[in-house]
C-alpha cells in the first residue's frame, strides 16, 4: 500500500484563487518530484481546460506563477484567497 501523504506530488508550495464576475481561477505551484515543479492553472467553471506546466527549479515555477497572476490582475481578476 502506498502512503500518498508522503508523495512529492501532494506538496503544494502555494495556491492562489482569483475571481471575476461569477468565475474563479485557481493557480498553484506543486512539487511533481524532488527536482520538478508544476504550475497548475484551473478555470473552475471548466476544469477540462486546466493547464499544467513543468519546471526544473522552484524559481522558474515562481516566475511563471507571478506572470500568470500579473496577467490575471491586468485582465480584471481579483485575488480572493491564497495559501502558502
Regions found by a protein language model. Give the residues of each.
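Short, hydrophobic/aromatic-rich segments at coil-to-beta transitions
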Residues: 8-16
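Basic K/R-rich, polyanion-interacting modules in nucleoproteins and related proteins
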Residues: 1, 15-19
Amino acid at each position: 500500500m502506498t502512503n500518498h501523504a508522503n508523495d512529492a506530488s501532494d506538496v503544494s508550495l502555494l495556491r492562489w484563487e482569483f475571481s471575476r464576475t461569477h468565475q474563479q481561477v485557481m493557480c498553484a505551484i506543486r512539487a511533481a518530484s524532488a527536482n520538478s515543479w508544476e504550475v497548475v492553472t484551473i478555470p473552475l467553471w471548466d476544469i477540462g481546460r486546466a493547464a499544467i506546466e513543468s519546471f526544473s527549479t522552484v524559481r522558474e515555477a515562481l516566475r511563471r506563477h507571478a506572470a500568470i497572476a500579473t496577467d490575471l490582475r491586468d485582465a480584471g481578476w481579483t485575488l480572493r484567497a491564497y495559501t502558502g
